[in-house]
């Protein structure tokens, strides 16, 4: 096991994305996070992570930080093991809804194995694994439990539940599996305590200071170099309040949808042919967000109203990247690198900041207790 840290908690962030989980953890009172290493395959997301966690722009290049910009498989093969106090990450588990059409042993469906391997070799006191609710009913979950019983994670116990980010202060009803793992030499941290279960934050709180009108289409100008490639950026969150070009038909549809409405409110002449044939189905498609409720889950294509309930509550447009980032809890000055689609993916894949902070509060208490236990154990051995 690594030595007890003097102050900062040495953290390894896997499948790190834009850094939402680490950012949330770092905002927990009393928990000082030292992100000693992050692993991220998407280079634009890696650049975003770098700029917000130890990196900087120097002569137009993103430099510094401690991000391995590549696959976790390559990282495990190329990099010497790093001992840390905490491992966090959300391994992508693809194909839950179509496993019958896929090889269930496809490595893409078992990237969490690489996560488990990283835990085994990094020997953290604690780990946090985030995933979609379907993880708990997948073959991957069964194998994960086998690893806990007698495999790579046999030295660890876990606590697990499906948590709603809205219960922890996010203005978003986003449900995710959270697995809190602890080495058996140290106490279980417990799952986060809800703070807003009976009083969810609403979109009105998020949107009240944002201009309703959008007078720009597309990203601002500017590029930075990362990985030897020029990429759009870096942009502060507040610079992401831009729209997109809509067809006249789309604008007519938006104008016909009332507050809290959706595609079922459209007159017949504005319905797409597929909607005429299918009068049932989800009410979220082409739906307006509700000002008096949390947002629905922000996904990676939130800028497309046909993908879900992503129309602005009152304006005839989809929500902007700026609005989506604020719903996810990102700070106004967070720095972003990438194309419109890449930044949307970074925003949509992130762990809501408030949920990360709630997890951090539990870990802070656990680390405080575990450090005391660790010190007493060392003292008795010395004696």
Regions from the language model: what does each represent?
Residues 75-84, 96-278:
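Class I S-adenosyl-L-methionine
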Residues 91-94, 184-185, 303:
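Short glycine-rich anion-binding loops that position phosphate/pyrophosphate groups of nucleotides
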Residues 52, 194-197, 313-315:
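Short Gly/aromatic-enriched secondary-structure transition segments
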Residues 232-383:
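C-terminal target-recognition/interaction regions appended to catalytic cores
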Residues 18, 141, 176, 349-353, ...:
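Short alpha-helical patches at coil-to-helix transitions and adjacent helical residues
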Residues 2-123, 133-137, 141-146:
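Core alpha/beta nucleotide-donor-binding catalytic domains of modification enzymes
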Residues 8, 174-176, 293-295:
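Extracellular structured ligand-interaction cores
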Residues 3-4, 153, 332-337:
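Short, hydrophobic/aliphatic alpha-helical segments
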């Amino acid at each position: 096991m690594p030595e007890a840290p003097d102050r900062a908690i040495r953290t390894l962030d896997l499948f790190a994305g834009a850094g939402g989980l680490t950012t949330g953890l770092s905002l927990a009172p009393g928990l000082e996070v030292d992100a000693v290493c992050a692993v991220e395959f998407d280079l634009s997301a890696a650049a975003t992570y770098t700029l917000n966690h130890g990196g900087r722009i120097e002569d137009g290049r993103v430099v510094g930080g401690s991000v391995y910009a590549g696959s976790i498989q390559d990282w495990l093969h190329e990099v010497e093991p790093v001992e840390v106090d905490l491992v966090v990450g959300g391994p992508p588990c693809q194909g839950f809804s179509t496993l019958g059409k896929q090889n269930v042993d496809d490595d893409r469906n078992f990237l969490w194995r690489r996560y488990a391997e990283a835990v085994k070799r990094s020997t953290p006191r604690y780990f946090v694994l985030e995933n979609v609710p379907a993880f708990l009913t997948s073959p991957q979950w069964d194998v994960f439990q086998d690893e806990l019983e007698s495999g790579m994670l046999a030295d660890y116990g876990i606590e697990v539940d499906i948590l709603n980010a809205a219960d922890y202060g996010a203005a978003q009803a986003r449900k995710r599996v959270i697995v809190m793992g602890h080495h058996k030499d140290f106490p279980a941290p417990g799952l986060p305590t809800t703070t807003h279960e009976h009083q969810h934050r609403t979109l009105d709180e998020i949107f009240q200071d944002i201009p309703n009108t959008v007078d720009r289409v597309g990203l601002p100008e500017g590029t930075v170099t990362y990985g030897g490639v020029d990429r759009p950026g870096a942009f502060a969150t507040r610079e992401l309040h831009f729209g997109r070009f809509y067809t006249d038909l789309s604008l007519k549809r938006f104008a016909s949808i009332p507050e809290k409405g959706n595609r079922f409110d459209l007159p017949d002449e504005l319905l797409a042919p597929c909607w005429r044939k299918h009068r049932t189905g989800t009410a979220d498609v082409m739906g307006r967000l509700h000002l008096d409720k949390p947002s629905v889950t922000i996904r990676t294509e939130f800028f497309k109203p046909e993908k879900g309930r992503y129309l602005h509550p009152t304006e005839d447009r989809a929500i902007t990247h700026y609005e989506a980032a604020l719903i996810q809890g990102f700070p106004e000055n967070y720095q972003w690198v990438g194309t419109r689609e890449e930044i949307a993916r970074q925003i949509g894949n992130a762990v809501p900041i408030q949920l990360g902070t709630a997890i951090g509060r539990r870990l802070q208490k656990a680390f405080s207790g575990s450090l005391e236990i660790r010190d007493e154990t060392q003292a008795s051995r010395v004696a």
